[in-house]
């Protein structure tokens, strides 16, 4: 049984109903429909904190999805799960892969910046100021890209860039 049929959340049910209607009326291939079904089930599992199940669905969706834009969101969600699991190297990889397909994902740039900033803070605690500076510089570059895509968002990042002298 499709995960969307067993989910008790009203919003998820509403989304599933609308998605099913769209799948019926929009001309798409069976592969695209199947990819979307896996993506939808992945989002449902992810929203419930069932990350292993979500990853299985997302991996299957990436195997089937041919549209780069749609793949970017699947890859982004895989990155979110790896971030939640503390697997930062994998998360950075998936955010990068998402951005290769869709360079207009400010949230991916932001999440990459947050990971780099965190690693910089870790390096400071370990007494390695050179590594900390490199991670902070990388965080700054990612935040600049996120801010450039969505001016007015990421106010805290914007302030951090100013305070640290990294805003140009």
UniProtKB/Swiss-Prot annotation:
One of its GO terms (cellular component) is chloroplast thylakoid membrane. PANTHER family: CELLULOSE SYNTHASE OPERON PROTEIN C, TPR REPEAT-CONTAINING PROTEIN MJ0263. Keywords: Chloroplast, Membrane, Photosynthesis, Plastid, Repeat, Thylakoid, TPR repeat. Belongs to the Ycf3 family. GO terms for biological process: photosynthesis. This is Photosystem I assembly protein Ycf3. It is a peripheral membrane protein. It comes from Buxus microphylla. Coiled coil: none annotated. InterPro entries: PSI_Ycf3_assembly, TPR-like_helical_dom_sf, TPR_rpt, Ycf3/AcsC/BcsC/TPR_MFPF. SMART domains: TPR (SM00028). It is found in: Plastid, Chloroplast thylakoid membrane. Essential for the assembly of the photosystem I (PSI) complex. May act as a chaperone-like factor to guide the assembly of the PSI subunits. TPR repeats lie at residues 35-68, 72-105, 120-153.
């Amino acid at each position: 049984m499709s995960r969307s049929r067993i989910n008790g959340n009203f919003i998820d049910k509403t989304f599933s109903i609308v998605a099913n209607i769209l799948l019926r009326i929009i001309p798409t291939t069976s592969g695209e429909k199947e990819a979307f079904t896996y993506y939808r089930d992945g989002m449902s599992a992810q929203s419930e904190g069932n990350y292993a199940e979500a990853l299985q669905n997302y991996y299957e969706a990436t195997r089937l999805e041919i549209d780069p834009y749609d793949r970017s969101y699947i890859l982004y969600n895989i990155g979110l799960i790896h971030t939640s699991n503390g697997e930062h190297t994998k998360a950075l990889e998936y955010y990068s892969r998402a951005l290769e397909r869709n360079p207009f994902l400010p949230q991916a740039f932001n999440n990459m910046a947050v990971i780099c900033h965190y690693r910089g803070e870790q390096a400071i605690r370990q007494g390695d100021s050179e590594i900390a500076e490199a991670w902070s510089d990388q965080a700054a570059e990612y935040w600049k890209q996120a801010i450039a895509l969505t001016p007015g968002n990421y106010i805290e990042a914007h302030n951090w860039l100013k305070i640290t002298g990294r805003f140009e």
